[in-house]
């Protein structure tokens, strides 16, 4: 239910009931995986504003094309862990202190998001234009997030927490579209079956479920890291 992670408290929304949630965490009535941490300071509000702004553009551009939206969003989501891990690595070298498993954790998060991207590339088969958007997004967001992390580390982790809140919401919508028959529940791509150890007859719905679980974990972890700073 409540997991202590290196003196950080992680709230696992899938495990907790509504009454067990802390005051600043609100649970959606429609889905128990929908958790939102309300901003408690200016830094949190800035992080949420950036997230909601990016969400608006994603919704406007992709609308119900969830697979294509995921391709672009996952290429952005793979950046923070790598940037944070790299900067934490250099900090450890500079100060000559062991940073525990923090560096490894951030790099594992980045690699997990990278596998999300590889999976959705296999599912959505992005066009040449969308591949260009991916490369441009990596460059622009990578530069932005690096500067944000250097000067406002807490805001950076809080923003990623909010990113992941939106990711969980987006993948929940994706599941609703599959369940309603609007999106075909096609066989899972081989890369997803191998990475998550799914059954060989697994479907797209099972892939979206495990990816959503990953995002919920990243959400909780980054909010907890922000709380500790």
Residue spans of the language-model regions?
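Non-heme di-metal
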Residues: 5, 9-229
């Amino acid at each position: 239910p409540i997991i202590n992670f290196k003196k950080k408290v992680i709230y696992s929304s899938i495990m907790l009931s509504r009454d067990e949630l802390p005051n600043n965490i609100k649970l959606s009535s429609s889905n128990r995986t929908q958790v939102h941490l309300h901003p408690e300071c200016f830094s949190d509000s800035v992080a949420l504003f950036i997230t909601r702004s990016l969400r608006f553009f994603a919704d406007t551009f992709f609308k119900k094309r969830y697979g294509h939206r995921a391709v672009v969003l996952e290429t952005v989501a793979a950046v923070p862990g790598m940037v944070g891990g790299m900067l934490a690595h250099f900090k450890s070298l500079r100060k000559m202190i062991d940073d525990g498993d923090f560096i490894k954790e951030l790099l594992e998060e980045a690699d997990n998001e990278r596998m999300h991207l590889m999976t959705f590339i296999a599912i959505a088969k992005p066009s040449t234009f969308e591949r260009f958007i991916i490369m441009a997004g990596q460059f622009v967001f990578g530069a932005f997030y690096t500067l944000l992390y250097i000067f406002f580390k807490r805001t950076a982790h809080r923003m990623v927490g909010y990113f992941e809140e939106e990711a969980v919401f987006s993948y929940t919508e994706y599941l609703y579209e599959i369940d309603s028959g609007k999106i075909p529940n096609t066989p899972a791509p081989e890369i997803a079956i191998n990475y998550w150890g799914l059954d060989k007859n697994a479907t797209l719905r099972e892939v979206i479920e495990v990816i959503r679980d990953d995002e919920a974990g990243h959400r909780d972890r980054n909010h907890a890291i922000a709380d500790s700073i």
